[in-house]
């Protein structure tokens, strides 16, 4: 089974409504009581609950390099983006993301787009 996504607080909770049909079971940190918590707490929650982290923040990529995975990290390199744009990019890259989530070697996926 492919792990659901856990969106960091720097991504609006509104994305869940838009993305849930493509990535079932996904949540935003606010939904699980982690809004405003330290990155390490979010990391530990994702690890304990089988989520892949999605963030603009390089700190999660740094944690992945330091501690390995799980959790896996999808590092969004899209600049200042609306929820609609983030949804469009993740939907467009759904197959690439699914391949990454099944990959047992890679822990970080950097997502960039010209959308």
Which residues does each PLM region occupy?
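Intrinsically disordered, low-complexity and often Lys/Arg-enriched segments
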Residues: 1-3, 114-115
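N-terminal first-folded block
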Residues: 4-49
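Small/polar loops that bind or transfer phosphate-bearing groups
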Residues: 7-8, 55-56, 78
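Short secondary-structure transition/capping segments
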Residues: 39-41, 65-69
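Short, hinge-like loop/turn segments at secondary-structure boundaries
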Residues: 44-46, 70-74
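Acidic, metal-binding active-site segment of PIN/NYN-like and related structure-specific nucleases
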Residues: 50-64
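C-terminal structural segments of small proteins and small subunits
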Residues: 73-114
């Amino acid at each position: 089974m492919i792990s659901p996504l856990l969106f960091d607080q720097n991504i609006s909770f509104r994305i869940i409504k838009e993305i849930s049909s493509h990535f079932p079971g996904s949540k935003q940190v606010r939904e699980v009581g982690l809004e405003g918590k330290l990155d390490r707490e979010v990391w530990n929650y994702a690890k304990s609950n089988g989520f892949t982290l999605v963030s603009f923040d390089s700190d999660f990529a740094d944690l992945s390099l330091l501690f390995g995975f799980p959790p896996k990290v999808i590092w969004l390199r899209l600049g200042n983006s609306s929820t609609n744009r983030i949804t469009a990019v993740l939907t467009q890259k759904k197959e690439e993301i699914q391949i990454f989530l099944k990959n047992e070697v890679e822990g970080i996926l950097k997502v960039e787009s010209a959308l």
